[in-house]
Amino acid sequence: MDKRILLVDDEPGIRKVLGIYLADKGYEVATAENGEDALRLFREAPPAIVLTDIKMPEMDGIELLQRIKAERPETEVIMFTGHGDMDLAILSLKHEATDFVTKPINDEVLEIALKRAGERIEMRRQLRDYTEKLERLVEEK
């Protein structure tokens, strides 16, 4: 599985602590402090998973989610909200976020969300491999 993650949060402390945590878990972490920087990094080296805060200045996490999904629908996006705003969390799920995690971030909850995202990535890979194999078999006949 691709172990690259893009972590987006306007709070430097969260980027630092989560970046260290994710690196310790074996992920290759890129960080961005806002949506514009995140999109630039995303386009340069698309990660398998994006972790983003919902409430950020300029471009919020919902807009970032929509733009990422428009460019690469298979990207798994996990949203953070520290504002107890379930309406925004639900809105993010409607825009095809993989999951959401509330702040302060619980390590176990984040690990479950990352595991679920990894399983979805692996299922898509297996389906793609299976489809390619079937297409080759059809071509051979």
Name the predicted role of every residue range:
Residues 6, 31-49:
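Acidic, metal-coordinating helix/loop segments flanking the phosphotransfer/catalytic sites
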